[in-house]
């Protein structure tokens, strides 16, 4: 039997706890070695302890003092953008070659969207999983980009307010900045813009995303087919990811886009929804589910490469 690589999860909140459950249920090459938090009374640490996972409420410093740290090859950071910079530096002081999956908007490593550029980043020591909105929408921008030149990409991510914990709320500015940049760097748009909406509806609604691209005129059927194939690729690790309706197309003439200028061409509108797998969080928290699923997929592919020298299918 192939040995599993041990991973530590930093951040015992919603994302960290959901990730722990996912790894326990679905990890093929990864297993949970430790859960790290800063609140000794957190539900995530208590749950990890009940499940037999080593815990510490003393942050990364506490992790380095755990006996299991010697065996840790992967770290998932589910804290905040500001904390991640400190965490990565401290981890590398003890283990320069440790693999860090950054689930915050810090982006000190390359942006990673598994279905778009995951395989190009398998040797990176730190990868950034962008944001929940980025994981849901950048693949769609990329789907259009592989058919035609995208001059502008804009996304609106609407998430249930109840699914937004303190980390998400503290990182709203970083969310928009990181997602906008990923639309360009990974999605292939010349200019990107991201908007996040915290929907206060009760009962909570599942994550919904709208993607707009302005591109050169191209074969609409080819774009629709590319979008459908990309959606199926994302569904391979986020089963609740789906197109809400058919892709819509409009011709635009001399449209003024702030920061870009006047554009004529094809406007493509893509409507998505993401339902969570409800491993730990409610089904409406698809925004958190897509982050943990993408993070685990990336780590699994890295681990498979480390084990066999090839990328897992």
Curated annotation (Swiss-Prot):
Binding site for NAD(+): 12-15, 163-171, 287
UniProt enzyme class: oxidoreductase
A single GO molecular function term of this UniProt record: acetaldehyde dehydrogenase (acetylating) activity
Active site (UniProt): 132
Reactions this protein catalyses: acetaldehyde + NAD(+) + CoA = acetyl-CoA + NADH + H(+)
One Pfam entry name: Semialdhyde_dh
Keyword NAD part of the UniProt annotation: yes
SUPFAM superfamilies, per the entry: Glyceraldehyde-3-phosphate dehydrogenase-like, C-terminal domain, NAD(P)-binding Rossmann-fold domains
Coiled-coil stretches noted in the UniProt entry, renumbered to this chain: none
Keyword tags: Aromatic hydrocarbons catabolism, NAD, Oxidoreductase
Record GO biological process: catabolic process
Catalytic activity, EC: 1.2.1.10
Family, as annotated: Belongs to the acetaldehyde dehydrogenase family.
Protein name, entry field: Acetaldehyde dehydrogenase 2
Organism: Paraburkholderia xenovorans (strain LB400)
